[in-house]
Every structure is written in C-alpha cells, then in structure tokens.
C-alpha cells in the first residue's frame, strides 16, 4: 500500500493510502474450464492508528464464489489477460501517485514563496 500526498487543489493536499494488490476483495473467480483468476482467502493489510500509534491490521477475505456463465466465452484465458494487464495497472497507479505527490509539492512551494514575498 503506497502512501502518497494526493493533490486536491493549490491550497490543499491529502495524505492517501492506496491499495494496489489484491485488486478486489471478491475472492476466487473461475471460468467454465476451472481456471481461477483470483485467490480465495486473500489477505488485506491496512495501515491504521491505534492509541496514537501506527499499526497494521490484517484481514482475510472470505467470500462465496460464482462461476462464469457457460454462454460467456473468452478469446484468451482470463489468467493470461490478468497477467498481461497487471504490470500495466501497477505502473499506471505508481506513476499517478508520483505525479500527484509532485503536484502537491510544487503547490506547497508556490504557496510558501507567495507567502514569503508578501
């Protein structure tokens, strides 16, 4: 879970924790051939505060799974699709966090310089 400063406006930035993986808490999803895309019993880790101190909470997601409809067909195996998209997703989310952090830093610098000049 990356922690970054989300750019809201020129005068406001918010600290944000964004979960990258697992993609969703829906558990295991299997196609008609029995090939599973996500794993049941996924673990989520949340960074929280308890009594003024940072702590990590661990949670296991338990959900019921449903199979795809036999009418639904994939041109490629869902696992191959996910394997191809996962690096692109991670790269885009990390790049977005870096860009928002940079925008927040530049806005804070502009604000500090305008306050110093006044």
From Swiss-Prot:
Instruction: Quote the Pfam families the UniProt record gives.
Output: ATP-synt
Where does the source fall among the domains of life?
Eukaryota
Its annotated compartments are:
Plastid, Chloroplast thylakoid membrane
List the record's Gene Ontology CC terms alphabetically: chloroplast thylakoid membrane; proton-transporting ATP synthase complex
For this chain, one GO molecular function annotation is: proton-transporting ATP synthase activity, rotational mechanism
Q: Does the keyword Disulfide bond apply?
A: yes
What InterPro entries does UniProt report for this protein, alphabetically? ATP_synth_F1_ATPase_gsu, ATP_synth_F1_gsu
Give the record's membrane topology: Peripheral membrane protein
What the entry lists under SUPFAM superfamilies is as follows: ATP synthase (F1-ATPase), gamma subunit
Q: Which pairs of positions does the record mark as disulfide bonds?
A: 30-36
Give the record's keywords alphabetically.
ATP synthesis, CF(1), Chloroplast, Disulfide bond, Hydrogen ion transport, Ion transport, Membrane, Plastid, Thylakoid, Transport
Q: How does it assemble?
A: F-type ATPases have 2 components, CF(1) - the catalytic core - and CF(0) - the membrane proton channel. CF(1) has five subunits: alpha(3), beta(3), gamma(1), delta(1), epsilon(1). CF(0) has four main subunits: a, b, b' and c.
Question: Which protein family is it in?
Answer: Belongs to the ATPase gamma chain family.
Q: What does this protein do?
A: Produces ATP from ADP in the presence of a proton gradient across the membrane. The gamma chain is believed to be important in regulating ATPase activity and the flow of protons through the CF(0) complex.
Protein name, as recorded: ATP synthase subunit gamma, chloroplastic
User: What is the source species?
Assistant: Vigna unguiculata (Cowpea)
Which lineage do the record's taxonomy fields give for this organism?
Eukaryota, Viridiplantae, Streptophyta, Embryophyta, Tracheophyta
């Amino acid at each position: 879970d990356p922690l970054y400063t989300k750019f809201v406006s020129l005068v406001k930035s918010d600290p944000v924790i964004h979960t990258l993986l697992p993609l969703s808490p829906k558990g295991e999803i299997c196609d008609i051939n029995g090939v599973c895309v996500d794993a049941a019993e996924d673990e989520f880790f949340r960074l929280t505060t308890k009594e003024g101190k940072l702590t990590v909470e661990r949670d296991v997601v338990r959900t019921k799974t449903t199979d795809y409809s036999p009418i639904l067909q994939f041109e490629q195996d869902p696992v191959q699709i996910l394997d191809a998209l996962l690096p692109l997703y991670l790269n885009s989310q990390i790049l977005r966090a870096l860009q928002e952090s940079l925008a927040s830093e530049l806005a804070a610098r502009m604000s500090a310089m305008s306050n110093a000049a006044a």
